[in-house]
Curated annotation (Swiss-Prot):
<feature type="region of interest" description="Disordered">
    <location>
        <begin position="13"/>
        <end position="90"/>
    </location>
</feature>
<keyword id="KW-0067">ATP-binding</keyword>
<dbReference type="Pfam" id="PF00270">
    <property type="entry name" value="DEAD"/>
</dbReference>
<keyword id="KW-0690">Ribosome biogenesis</keyword>
<dbReference type="GO" id="GO:0003724">
    <property type="term" value="F:RNA helicase activity"/>
</dbReference>
<dbReference type="Pfam" id="PF13959">
    <property type="entry name" value="CTE_SPB4"/>
</dbReference>
<dbReference type="InterPro" id="IPR014001">
    <property type="entry name" value="Helicase_ATP-bd"/>
</dbReference>
<keyword id="KW-0547">Nucleotide-binding</keyword>
<keyword id="KW-0698">rRNA processing</keyword>
<feature type="short sequence motif" description="Q motif">
    <location>
        <begin position="138"/>
        <end position="167"/>
    </location>
</feature>
<feature type="short sequence motif" description="DEAD box">
    <location>
        <begin position="301"/>
        <end position="304"/>
    </location>
</feature>
<feature type="region of interest" description="Disordered">
    <location>
        <begin position="662"/>
        <end position="690"/>
    </location>
</feature>
<keyword id="KW-0347">Helicase</keyword>
<dbReference type="GO" id="GO:0005730">
    <property type="term" value="C:nucleolus"/>
</dbReference>
<dbReference type="Pfam" id="PF00271">
    <property type="entry name" value="Helicase_C"/>
</dbReference>
<feature type="domain" description="Helicase C-terminal">
    <location>
        <begin position="404"/>
        <end position="580"/>
    </location>
</feature>
<feature type="domain" description="Helicase ATP-binding">
    <location>
        <begin position="172"/>
        <end position="366"/>
    </location>
</feature>
Length: 709
């Protein structure tokens, strides 16, 4: 009998019929888990390829992500090539996202081009009478000022009449009752001269034998920032540049300057000593030649900021030391027979009241009768100041700022832009001055090359209009650069516009002449900061305008400003679309070509950053610092400025970055990693430790920006 034939069944192995291999029990559990994940991933990829084959070529299953985002790497950069012709390798994680789609909060008006003048801030004036202007109905003779000093003010300093706060302070401080004084006045109302004029007038009435720099220190003036100290020093020098008081010598002691030079000036003799609390305390402790036994006036300028910046303990030590060293011998003179303390502040809040209670005794309360008090006791902004705000989606912030500047550089000669951190100042400075397209490169060639290694603090704003100059100022710059930048910006009188990018280091006390517009690109960290920022314009009776950028989730901040500082602030007509159309439209047109031009401007900068690694690093640092600074808003305002409401991808877009936020932060991470790639988190911290760390970091930020000491 023949053998039965052998039948063999062959089954073709494919992805769908393949079963996972049995895992060996002898292997480690981590290896088995890794194998399961790999098998699951291979199975998913196989199913995706099957769906793709079944879909055919009719284009019915278009990849949604590819329709929304274009991945590019190392684009072929040509500054003269239109944005839509950009070619790139599609293997990177960078994205080109649109500015004008996908955000319901944009609310673009379709008829903004019909009346471009309505989008101009300068087109809308105010008819209110200036609340900080010199009083025309009086003169300095009517407030007991010496005739020769009044003539000097009129002829050399172009000041013909006192302001309201000066009219209030001069008679009281020239009086021989010699009481302590609390001076409260609006920003830009002339507080510096309100206390300097009485000091100088009473010093010039001293006997002739005391008219020398070696007769002693008669006045000590403290201010929170180096820039404000330098400004007070300059005003004192101008005031004393006359035959009556030419012998009065002022000295400025601030951080960033050589202590050896300051000690040499003190040894030669000083009559008015001006300084920051930190540096002044250092000299009181370590400079033997500093004799404060004859001090008759102690002035605390910007008292609210002195307290906010953590100077309370330092101020207490300084005041106690001055009191202990006081040994006034000659009392029958024109100067006070006791040490008189004056506290100046634009706001009257709890911290200032606490300082007033400890530093002042039986003090006079001096305040302009023009200023009306709010319910909370805070002072208002000048009446003639036009205040606006605009709600801008995060990805449109950069082009909206550029549009605002482009539409106003012709009518406004000096513009100040406040940002939240120094890294953001550096980014916008570089973004505005860089040469990208052919016209900008041609303008850049005309400029003289800077010497290698120099830090540039001012340059032509090629990305705005080429005719304007842009400046930067923040606490990380050296004192020499900060001083020269302020001097250049203040003294500039040419036909072009001048734009100062700065942090809050320039928000307090600085009297920058003829500032027409203040832009708060980043919201202030407190309502007091808002008041002082806008106080850089509309000073001494001049008109001025201020506009603040807010994100859609931050609009509730307007109600807080109205209730806390009585801000008379209005919304900018037509919102961001009005700004963009005014800045990017060519002529009066009804078309929306401004959207294309704004997009082109943004994409040109993005391509430039992709090709330029140093600029890309600057943008990354600015993004990271902005997010960190955003987290330092007051706890009472945390519901308005909530970190969870930030769209980090759109915020990155406002810094011209195409990388995902996670990739940006990862590039800057310096945390040690364990073997295997996990981050060593270390010991977890309690909520109290984290809160204390945040407070300490905030104070370090203040110290850096304002250069304490």
């Amino acid at each position: 009998m023949a053998d039965e034939p052998l039948l063999l069944n062959f089954v073709v192995d494919n992805a769908q019929s393949r079963k996972p291999e049995a895992l060996k029990s002898s292997r480690r559990w981590t290896d088995r888990a890794r194998d399961r994940k790999r098998q699951k991933r291979n199975s998913n990829e196989s199913s995706k390829s099957t769906v793709k084959r079944n879909s055919g070529t009719n284009g019915a299953s278009t990849d949604y992500k590819n329709s929304q985002k274009e991945k590019v790497i190392n684009p072929v950069f040509d500054p003269r090539k239109p944005a839509h012709e950009l070619k790139g390798n599609k293997r990177d994680n960078t994205f080109v996202t649109s500015l004008f789609t996908g955000d319901d909060s944009e609310h673009f008006s379709q008829d903004v081009g019909q009346n471009l003048e309505d989008n101009q801030i300068s087109n809308i004036g105010t008819t209110k009478e200036a609340s900080n202007a010199p009083i025309k109905t009086t003169n300095f003779a009517g407030v007991q000022l010496d005739t020769q000093l009044a003539d000097h003010l009129n002829n050399k300093m172009n000041i013909s009449a006192p302001t309201a706060i000066q009219s209030c302070c001069l008679p009281a401080l020239l009086n021989t009752d010699d009481k302590d004084a609390f001076i409260e006045a609006q920003t830009g109302s002339g507080k510096t001269l309100a206390y300097l004029l009485p000091i100088v007038q009473r010093l010039i009435r001293l006997p002739k034998n005391l008219h020398t720099r070696t007769s002693g220190i008669y006045a000590v003036i403290m201010a929170p920032t180096r820039e404000l100290c330098q400004q007070i020093y300059n005003v004192a020098n101008k005031l004393n540049n006359n035959p009556l008081s030419h012998w009065i010598v002022s000295c400025n002691v601030i951080g960033g300057e050589k202590k050896k030079s300051e000690k040499a000036r003190i040894r030669k003799g000083v009559n008015i000593l001006i300084g920051t609390p930190g540096r002044l305390a250092d000299h009181l402790e370590n400079t033997e030649a500093l004799d404060v036994s004859q001090v008759r006036w102690v002035v605390l300028d910007e008292g609210d900021r002195l307290m906010d910046m953590g100077f309370e303990e330092t101020l207490t030590k300084i005041l106690s030391y001055l009191e202990s060293q006081s040994s006034i011998i000659k009392k029958d003179l024109s100067i006070p027979s006791r040490k008189v303390t004056m506290l100046c502040s634009a706001t009257m809040k709890d911290t200032v009241k606490r300082l007033s209670d400890s530093a002042l005794k039986d003090a006079l309360y001096l305040k302009s009768s023009i200023v009306e008090e709010t319910n909370d006791g805070y002072s208002q902004a000048p009446e003639q100041l036009l205040q606006r705000y605009v709600v801008v989606p995060p990805k449109l912030r950069l082009v909206s700022l550029v549009a605002l500047l482009r539409s106003h550089v012709r009518s406004y000669k000096k513009i100040i832009i406040f940002l939240s951190c120094s890294d953001s100042v550096d980014f916008h400075f570089e973004a505005f001055r860089c040469a990208i397209n052919a016209d900008e490169m041609e303008e850049a060639v005309k400029e003289k090359p800077d010497s290698e290694g120099d830090i540039i603090s001012n340059a032509p704003a090629l990305r705005i209009d080429g005719k304007s100059n842009v400046y930067r100022l923040h606490g990380s710059l050296s004192q020499q650069i900060r001083t020269s930048t302020l001097n250049l910006f203040s003294s500039s009188e040419d036909s072009g516009s001048h734009i100062l990018l700065c942090t809050d280091v320039a928000a307090r006390g600085l009297d920058l002449p003829n500032v027409d517009l203040v832009v708060q690109y980043d919201a202030p960290f407190s309502t007091d900061d808002y008041l002082h920022r806008i106080g850089r314009t509309a000073r001494a009776g001049h008109n001025g305008a201020a506009i603040m950028f807010l994100l859609p989730k931050e609009s509730e901040y307007i109600n807080l400003l109205k209730s806390s500082v009585s801000a008379n602030i209005l919304e900018q007509p037509n919102g961001p679309s009005g700004l963009l159309s005014a800045g990017f439209s060519q002529g009066k047109t009804n078309t929306n070509d401004w959207q294309d031009r704004a997009t082109e401007w943004q994409l040109e900068l993005e391509r430039f950053i992709l090709e330029n690694e140093p600029m890309r690093n600057i943008a990354k640092r600015a993004f990271t610092s902005y997010v960190r600074a955003y987290a330092t808003h007051l706890s009472s305002e945390r519901s308005i400025f909530n970190m969870r409401d930030l769209h980090l991808g759109h915020i990155a877009k406002s810094f011209a970055l195409r990388e995902a936020p996670g990739k940006i932060s990862g590039a800057n991470s310096s945390k040690p990693r364990k073997q295997g790639g996990s981050v060593d988190k270390g010991k977890s911290k309690s909520s109290k430790d984290i809160a204390a760390l945040m407070h300490r970091k905030a104070m370090e930020h203040y110290s850096t920006e304002h250069n304490i000491g």
